Amino acid sequence: MKTKIIVIVGPTAVGKTALAIEVAKRFNGEVVSGDSQQVYRGLDIGTAKASPEEQAAVPHHLIDVREITESYSAFDFVSEAKMTIEDIQSRGKLAIIAGGTGLYIQSLLEGYHLGGETPYEEILAYRASLEPYSDEELAHLVEQAGLEIPQFNRRRAMRALEIAHFGQDLENQEILYEPLIICLDDERSQLYERINHRVDLMFEAGLLDEAKWLFDHSPNVQAAKGIGYKELFPYFRGEQTFEEARESLKQATRRFAKRQLTWFRNRMQVTFYQIGESGVQDRILSQIEEFLDD
């Protein structure tokens, strides 16, 4: 019997953390971060971690589990998330995955057998190589490979091509979870306004000092490549004014949000909710209750 879990995804600044905490309080749950940057200690503001008060109110996992000099991959996330979910379930609680790193969350839900002969990085690279293809081009590749896909869609086509490419190593995947995947969204203009406002609040909270600390200590590590830090490095090098760097960060974050939405729309089976609609939280909570009672 598969473990039921709640998954909350969506673009940056849309309110995933607040909803995850509300769901955890309502359904006796704990939050597992699905964010590739929140694993790093010392990077709190730019990664929009839950506040100490929020983390005290509801247990959070996979936050502050790496030093900034350490690497972190989808392989690491899947391995650690599986152990964390098992621990949460063993205590009779509900696991709530919340974050915006679509690759990590999809890899967890699709249950790739990470101990197989095919290196996980090869699987991810092949998957990324398929992303630029249109639906028609993917359909042609499927036909060329002699594959049959009832009710064609991108997700099924790409999955079939991956299995055909790598063979049994992928076919022997282990699906452990029955997820309800909720994707929060907002009107584009409203979302961009939220992003711009949150960036301003981050600067008020000390983002510049946090980014300067990272720049001074480890400017070339994986942790420094995330949105929220590298956009400020030209300012520290004297190549941009502060206002130029701040606008660059806002623009990069808006573009990132657009890419996130594209991923969730094309690669995962989600239920979309517009956060600006009246009564949306009550409808989400009702759907979760029905899912858990089923």
From Swiss-Prot:
- Sorted alphabetically, which keywords does the UniProt record give? ATP-binding, Magnesium, Nucleotide-binding, Transferase, tRNA processing
Q: Which GO terms describe its molecular function?
A: ATP binding; tRNA dimethylallyltransferase activity
Residues annotated as site: Interaction with substrate tRNA: 101, 127
Please write the reaction equations for the catalytic activity of this protein: adenosine(37) in tRNA + dimethylallyl diphosphate = N(6)-dimethylallyladenosine(37) in tRNA + diphosphate
Q: Which cofactor does it need?
A: Mg(2+)
Q: Where does substrate bind?
A: 12-17
The record's listing under SUPFAM superfamilies reads: P-loop containing nucleoside triphosphate hydrolases
EC numbers listed for it are 2.5.1.75
Q: Which domain of life is it from?
A: Bacteria
The record's annotation in InterPro entries points to:
Dimethylallyltransferase, IPT, P-loop_NTPase
Q: Where does the record place the region Interaction with substrate tRNA?
A: 35-38
Provide the binding site for ATP.
10-17
Give the UniProt family note: Belongs to the IPP transferase family.
Q: What function is annotated for this protein?
A: Catalyzes the transfer of a dimethylallyl group onto the adenine at position 37 in tRNAs that read codons beginning with uridine, leading to the formation of N6-(dimethylallyl)adenosine (i(6)A).
Subunit structure and binding partners: Monomer.
Q: Which HAMAP family match?
A: IPP_trans
Name of the featured protein: tRNA dimethylallyltransferase
Species name for this entry? Streptococcus pneumoniae (strain Hungary19A-6)
Q: What is the lineage of its organism?
A: Bacteria, Bacillati, Bacillota, Bacilli, Lactobacillales
Gene behind the chain: miaA
